Structures are given as structure tokens and as C-alpha cells.
């Protein structure tokens, strides 16, 4: 059997608020949509942290559990938990095989965490990953730049995913948005 994957996750810090959106599509291989309503964005650490994943579903659940453990270990310090998780992920032969990426955020910090050991904080407070990530990122940057006084973080996140869903065949319009 092949891998279950493909999604789009978008996150933004905007006007003192933060929001993360993800679509619900799970694709089996490159040809079959297996699920339309997957929940790929979650609140962690007593609702103070948002996390979203793109990639293999089973791998992502493993990473969610691992990240949540690091958050507990480091008392909710997002940056420290992300760095320690990335070190463990990169340094462990079995974990290196996991095929997923995470975006994690709290009210002040937004980070991309990958299995290559990268922990990246964007300059503009916007991140997007997954098959429709480039489309969502472009849409989100345009919306923030040209309509920021009229839109909330949640509205920008949702609109960015809707635009990605119009373009990317691996992104659907069953959008879940979480905010802090």
C-alpha cells in the first residue's frame, strides 16, 4: 500500500492575533482521494499552541505526540520544544524516515519544523506547507499586504486556503481554522 498524504496548511500572525488553517483532504498515492474531512490542525498544550501537519498521516500523528511531549517537558516554551524535537527527529535513524512537516505557533512565535533539523521562523509572520503551500503563501502575503486593515488573521487564513483549494488538486475546501 502507498502513503496517505497531500494537504495544505497555512498560518499567520496578524494584528496581534494568530490563526492556522488546514484543508481536510487525504490522498492515497497520486490518484485517489480517501478522505475529505481530516483534521490536520490542532490545539496543543492546554489550547495555547497550534500545530498543523503536511505529509504522511501516520507519521504526522507520531510527530504530534512527540512535539506535545516536548512542550510538556519544556513548560510550553515553543522555541525550545521545536528545537529539541528537530534535534531528536534528525538524530534518530527511525524518526528520520518520517515523511511530514509541522507548523507550530503560539501567540508570539511561528515556526516550521522539519525532519532535516530545520526550525525556521519567517520574517513576515506567515508560513504555508504542503502541496498547495505555495499558492496559499502567495495569497496570504497579498491579502496581508493589501487588505490587512479589513481582514482578521482568521479571515486571511481561510481565504488563503480557499484560493489554494481552487488551484491545487490535492487541497479541498473543507477548511478547519483554529485561532489563538
UniProtKB/Swiss-Prot annotation:
What are the annotated GO cellular component locations?
HslUV protease complex; proteasome core complex
UniProt-annotated location(s): Cytoplasm
Q: Where is the signal peptide?
A: none
Going by the UniProt record, its keywords in alphabetical order are:
Allosteric enzyme, Cytoplasm, Hydrolase, Metal-binding, Protease, Sodium, Threonine protease
EC number(s) stated in the UniProt entry for this protein = 3.4.25.2
Q: Has UniProt tagged this entry with the keyword Metal-binding?
A: yes
Major subcellular location class: cytoplasm
Gene Ontology biological-process annotations: proteolysis involved in protein catabolic process
Entries under PROSITE patterns matching the protein: PROTEASOME_BETA_2 (PS51476)
Q: What residues does Na(+) bind to?
A: 165, 168, 171
**Subunit (UniProt):** A double ring-shaped homohexamer of HslV is capped on each side by a ring-shaped HslU homohexamer. The assembly of the HslU/HslV complex is dependent on binding of ATP.
Functional note: Protease subunit of a proteasome-like degradation complex believed to be a general protein degrading machinery.
Which HAMAP family would you find in this protein's record? HslV
Query: Can you tell me which family this protein belongs to?
Result: Belongs to the peptidase T1B family. HslV subfamily.
Name of the protein described by the UniProt record: ATP-dependent protease subunit HslV
Top-down, what is the taxonomic lineage of the species of origin? Answer: Bacteria, Bacillati, Bacillota, Bacilli, Bacillales
Q: Which gene encodes it?
A: hslV
Amino acid at each position: 500500500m502507498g502513503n496517505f498524504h497531500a494537504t495544505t496548511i497555512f498560518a499567520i500572525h496578524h494584528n496581534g492575533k494568530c490563526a492556522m488553517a488546514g484543508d481536510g483532504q487525504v490522498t492515497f498515492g497520486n490518484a485517489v482521494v480517501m478522505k475529505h474531512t481530516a483534521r490536520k490542525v490542532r490545539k496543543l498544550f492546554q489550547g495555547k499552541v497550534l500545530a498543523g501537519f503536511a505529509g504522511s498521516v501516520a507519521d504526522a500523528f507520531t510527530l504530534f505526540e512527540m512535539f506535545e511531549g516536548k512542550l510538556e517537558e519544556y513548560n510550553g516554551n515553543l522555541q525550545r520544544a521545536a528545537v529539541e524535537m528537530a534535534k531528536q527527529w534528525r538524530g534518530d535513524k527511525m524518526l528520520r524516515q518520517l515523511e511530514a512537516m509541522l507548523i507550530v505557533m503560539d501567540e508570539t512565535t511561528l515556526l516550521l519544523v522539519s525532519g532535516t533539523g530545520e526550525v525556521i521562523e519567517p520574517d513576515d509572520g506567515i508560513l504555508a506547507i504542503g502541496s498547495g503551500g505555495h499558492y496559499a503563501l502567495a495569497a496570504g502575503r497579498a491579502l496581508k499586504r493589501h487588505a490587512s486593515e479589513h481582514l482578521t488573521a482568521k479571515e486571511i487564513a481561510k481565504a488563503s486556503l480557499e484560493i489554494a483549494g481552487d488551484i491545487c488538486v490535492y487541497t479541498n475546501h473543507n477548511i478547519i481554522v483554529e485561532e489563538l
